[in-house]
């Protein structure tokens, strides 16, 4: 969970009131945080706050925490409003970045009066959002620049690796390739773009480099100080919805400091957008749902008042609450999310405990013990366990694996297209893991025990989640034989007889792939990964793998 530092005096300045340490321990709960540490430095008291929600980047700064507390205490109510004025600034996005880092969104914030506290909060929020919400800059990276040194229009373009600029913290020019090799941030994040045909650059009309997303800003424009009055913010990534949210978080935090937000027109080949877009989002919830699940006998107006203290605009109509909520949030996906806000505003400590009416005695699931035994065997074979997400997308499951698209369980309203479906097999997740770790030493030997979700029309839910085991070995020395040795050892330890029958599969090399049969029924597949699949994942060493269903191997 994200942890971040704030000064007590800065928080109190933003809230508009002073509180004791004991009061602060309770107040930060409204912002889904806990007070993790307190210390004094140079006569100032500092808090380390531990956020308990990875889906609320708007709460990872002094500005966000203070804003939430002001509303929770009733100092302000309803939907926060932020004015966005137009500017004449335009950013042109190069189509060549489509497979490099396709999306960039931008904003200007002027009228800033930064001091050491507000400057450190801005930089800390930038880093926390990119690190956690942006998955170590893979999905979101943020740049902040002194706009007085920028000459619009601005171009987000594909650059040759031999182009040069002076990166932040350096005095001499480096080529883009040299930055990845010599600069601290290039070494840390270079794997995100190293294998791309072009590198992304953000430049102004005079050719001055602002940044090399997602690696490093330039020394010329990327150094922001307490003297800076006007900043230009860029957010780049792979998902337009996600980078838009990150931009909204940044600009509204600065607006809490008195900054004035100005929009930027962003021109792509096929469309144009104006950013930031702070249009409130809509949701609707049944009031009886709130009462039923909370167990609280709340009147309609009481629910309305509680929601307004959590920054909603509320209109009551026909037993429903029609809601508007701020554009810096994107975590409201179900009525339960609204219920959570009601309970936070009500106060969990104010809910009276009840004695459970049903006594049960629990025991472990024997099949879970079987899965744990599988894990122990894999570790004993010298493999490292990984745990990846059940959520994925069709490109990962099919296109990158060189197989035709099939029907899978898709999410109706995904937060991100990256997480728009449930996986039907695990091996693509292992390939993605290997792709993300090409900078690490080989050989790499990994496995995962996890669920695959399949469509089953005979069931009430039309789906079934099946436990599976997937194994992948990456290294120049690995062949089909190495994967089969592990499968042989596994089956021998389990006392299961099996055979391999030659087959064809687009993810594997023809003639080096077979289906795994137990009692004549297909339970999995094993083989050497096809070169096209390796290329799709930017993996330069051979990979052998197998994936099997676990239930057919289970003997109670």
Swiss-Prot record:
Subcellular location: Cytoplasm
List of residues binding Mg(2+): 331, 337, 340-341
Cofactor: Mg(2+)
EC number: 6.1.1.20
Reactions catalysed, as given in the entry: tRNA(Phe) + L-phenylalanine + ATP = L-phenylalanyl-tRNA(Phe) + AMP + diphosphate + H(+)
Domain B5 residue range list: 278-353
InterPro entries xref list: aa-tRNA-synth_II/BPL/LPL (IPR045864), B3/B4_tRNA-bd (IPR005146), DNA-bd_dom_put_sf (IPR009061), Phe-tRNA-ligase_IIc_bsu (IPR045060), Phe-tRNA-synth_IIc_bsu_arc_euk (IPR004531), Phe-tRNA_synthase-like_B3/B4 (IPR020825), Phe_tRNA_ligase_beta2_arc (IPR022918), PheRS_beta_core (IPR041616)
UniProt keywords, alphabetically: Aminoacyl-tRNA synthetase, ATP-binding, Cytoplasm, Ligase, Magnesium, Metal-binding, Nucleotide-binding, Protein biosynthesis
Coiled coil: none
One record GO biological process: phenylalanyl-tRNA aminoacylation
One GO molecular-function entry: ATP binding
Top-level taxon of origin: Archaea
UniProt GO cellular component terms: phenylalanine-tRNA ligase complex
Principal subcellular localization: cytoplasm
Matches recorded under HAMAP family: Phe_tRNA_synth_beta2
UniProt xrefs under PANTHER family: PHENYLALANINE--TRNA LIGASE BETA SUBUNIT, PHENYLALANYL-TRNA SYNTHETASE BETA CHAIN AND LEUCINE-RICH REPEAT-CONTAINING PROTEIN 47
Family to which the UniProt record says this protein belongs: Belongs to the phenylalanyl-tRNA synthetase beta subunit family. Type 2 subfamily.
Subunit and partners: Tetramer of two alpha and two beta subunits.
NCBIfam families: pheT_arch
UniProt protein name: Phenylalanine--tRNA ligase beta subunit
Organism of this sequence: Pyrococcus abyssi (strain GE5 / Orsay)
Taxonomic lineage of the native organism: Archaea, Methanobacteriati, Methanobacteriota, Thermococci, Thermococcales
Gene: pheT
């Amino acid at each position: 969970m994200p942890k971040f530092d704030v000064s007590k005096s800065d928080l109190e300045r933003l809230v508009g009131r002073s509180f004791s340490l004991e009061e602060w321990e309770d107040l930060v709960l409204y912002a889904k945080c806990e007070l993790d540490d307190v210390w004094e430095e140079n006569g100032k008291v500092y808090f380390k706050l531990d956020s308990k929600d990875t889906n609320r980047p708007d709460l990872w700064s002094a500005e966000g925490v203070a804003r939430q507390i002001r509303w929770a205490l009733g100092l302000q109510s309803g939907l926060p409003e932020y004015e966005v004025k137009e500017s004449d600034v335009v950013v042109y996005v190069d189509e060549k970045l489509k497979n490099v880092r396709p999306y960039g969104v931008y904003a200007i914030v002027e009228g800033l009066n930064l001091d050491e506290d507000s400057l450190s909060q801005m930089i800390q929020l930038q880093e926390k959002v990119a690190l956690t919400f942006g998955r170590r800059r893979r999905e979101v990276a943020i740049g902040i620049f002194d706009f007085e040194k920028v000459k619009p229009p601005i171009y987000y373009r594909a650059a040759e690796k031999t182009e040069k600029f002076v990166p932040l913290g350096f005095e001499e020019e480096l080529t883009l390739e040299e930055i990845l090799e010599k600069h601290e941030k290039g070494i840390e994040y270079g794997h995100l773009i190293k294998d791309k045909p072009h590198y992304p650059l953000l430049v102004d009309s005079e050719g001055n480099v602002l940044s090399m997303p997602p690696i490093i800003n330039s020394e010329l424009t990327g150094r922001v100080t307490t003297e800076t009055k006007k900043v230009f913010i860029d957010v780049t990534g792979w998902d337009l919805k996600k980078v838009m949210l990150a931009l909204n978080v940044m600009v509204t935090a600065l607006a809490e400091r008195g900054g004035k937000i100005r929009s930027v027109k962003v021109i792509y080949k096929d469309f144009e957008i104006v950013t930031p877009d702070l249009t409130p989002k809509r949701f609707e919830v049944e009031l009886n749902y709130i009462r039923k699940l909370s167990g609280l006998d709340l009147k309609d107006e009481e629910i309305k008042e509680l929601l307004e203290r959590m920054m909603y605009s509320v209109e009551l109509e026909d037993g429903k609450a029609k809601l508007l909520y701020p554009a810096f949030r994107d975590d409201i996906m179900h009525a339960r999310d609204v219920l959570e806000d009601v309970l936070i505003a009500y106060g969990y400590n104010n809910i009276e405990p009840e004695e459970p009416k049903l006594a049960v005695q629990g025991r472990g699931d024997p099949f879970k013990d079987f899965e744990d035994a599988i894990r122990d065997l894999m570790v004993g074979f010298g493999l490292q366990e990984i745990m990846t997400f059940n959520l994925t997308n069709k490109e990962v499951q099919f296109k990158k694996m060189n197989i035709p698209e099939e029907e899978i369980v898709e999410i109706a309203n995904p937060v991100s297209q990256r997480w728009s479906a449930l996986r039907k097999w695990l091996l693509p997740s292992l390939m993605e893991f290997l792709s993300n770790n090409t900078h690490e030493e080989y050989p790499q030997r990994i496995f995962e025990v996890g669920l695959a979700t399949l469509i089953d029309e005979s069931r009430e839910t039309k789906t079934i989640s099946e436990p599976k085991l997937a194994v992948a070995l990456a290294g120049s020395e690995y062949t089909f034989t190495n994967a089969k040795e592990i499968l042989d050892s596994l089956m021998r330890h389990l006392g299961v007889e099996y055979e391999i029958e030659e087959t064809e599969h687009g993810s594997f090399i023809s003639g080096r792939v077979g289906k795994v049969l137990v009692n004549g029924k297909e339970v999995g597949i094993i083989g050497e990964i096809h070169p096209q699949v390796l290329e799709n994942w930017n993996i330069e060493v051979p990979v052998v793998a197998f994936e099997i269903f676990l239930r057919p191997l289970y003997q109670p």
